[in-house]
Amino acid sequence: MTRGAWMCRQYDDGLKIWLAAPRENEKPFIDSERAQKWRLSLASLLFFTVLLSDHLWFCAEAKLTRARDKEQQQQQQQQQQRQQRQRQEQRQRQRQHEPSWPALLASMGEPSPAAQAHRLLSASPSPTLPPSLGGGGGGKGGRGTDSRGKPPLPGNSARPAWRLETCYPQGASSGQCFTVDSADAVCARNWSRGAAARGEQGQQTRGPPQPTPLWNLSDFYLSFCNSYTLWELFSGLSSPNTLNCSLDVVLKEGGEMTTCRQCVEAYQDYDHHAQEKYEEFESVLHKYLQSEEYSVKSCPEDCKIVYKAWLCSQYFEVAQLNCRKTIPCKQYCLEVQTRCPFILPDNDEVIYGGLSSFICTGLYETFLTNDEPECCDVRREAKPKSPSKGAGDRGGACPRTSLSASSAPRLGPSRLRLCVLVLMLLHTVLTASVAHNATALGVGGVHTLDERSASEE
């Protein structure tokens, strides 16, 4: 039975009775509005479902990333332990093949090697360290595991308390670099005046032959801040913790052993605190930097190198001499600010978006002058083999991509396809709703005209 205004005419008892065909839907326009509302509700539900799934997806990825980081950290710790054991075994093998300390002194021309070795072995234990930088605790509680308190190794007790390492930077006077481990061994030596006394030594060659000095302060470096020599520290940082640490304390023959030992231990204490701060920074960087692709110009290794240089320049405000190229030490603060990761905009904390995670404070209050200490430029030098003890290398070359750490997991190809699909579905639903609404309006107009014509008839 067709819909419309079809009429049939019947006569009953002389009365005209009009019988209209029954209609299936009395109000088609209301039904079209209801269907349109349902479509919009379904579209909104679909949109919010996609948003919720995206948020859940992001949470799941973050959880998987944290689990993967924990596994990598455990693997790195195990690898570091294996490497430490291998290094210890190699050192033990080297110690077995190395000559004894008295024989080495005798070969280098040191007078009375037995007496020197006896004085080195019979030295009194290290005294209590002075307070650390910034009002920290003394060395008795904080440096209990340091190598200064270690007993001499059995079977090799005459060996010096420092180890041979690679020169950093390669500017040592003798071509050999050492890392100081014991203050007693440092203060028991007869030192030369380094590069400052080479001219005097050259002038004295015409006179009677002078005994060649055995050691040079410019050949001995700190353990962590391995670009600072003892010569630079004694000549520039002459009063650590209110101590008198001038060059005369070390270079003067028959000088005070206790004062010299306290000065070297104070320098080692500063170096130890700088290493602790660096390890804290490295752990925070590894915790919050989920991806190494945070910049197109820098990488985490660049950030660590300049941060270490800035940190050491804050603990040791001295001018460095054995450098290929020098820059003002305060410039490293700006280098850290530009090379370390930035805080990117996020859904929760947009107010901090675009700010640097490291901000230099008080740098522009005092303008840079010629009196500022100069530090070694490590920005373009090769990365040192061991930037910190116990810190594992997590990568080689720097990544050179434009994605940042927080946007990388959100702008993957799968999520882009999902967003495009949702937009296409919403566009299709809205187009169908508009087309159906226009059709319903046209049918409703036809029904209205038919009803009016029937009423008139």
Curated annotation (Swiss-Prot):
Auxillary component of the NALCN sodium channel complex, a channel that regulates the resting membrane potential and controls neuronal excitability. The keyword Transmembrane applies. Residues 70-98, 122-160, 381-409 are annotated as: Disordered. Residues 86-98 have a biased composition (Basic and acidic residues). Residues 73-83 have a biased composition (Low complexity). Residues 133-142 have a biased composition (Gly residues). The chain crosses the membrane at residues 40-60, 418-438. It comes from the Eukaryota. Belongs to the NALF family. Disulfide bonds join C187-C260, C225-C312, C245-C260, C303-C340, C323-C376, C329-C375, C333-C360. Its main location: membrane. GO terms for biological process: calcium ion import across plasma membrane. GO terms for cellular component: plasma membrane. This is NALCN channel auxiliary factor 1. Component of the NALCN channel complex. NALCN complex consists of NALCN and auxiliary subunits, UNC79, UNC80 and NACL1. These auxiliary subunits are essential for the NALCN channel function. Keywords: Cell membrane, Disulfide bond, Glycoprotein, Membrane, Transmembrane, Transmembrane helix. It is a multi-pass membrane protein. InterPro entries: NALCN_aux_factor_1/2. It is found in: Cell membrane. Glycans are attached at N216.
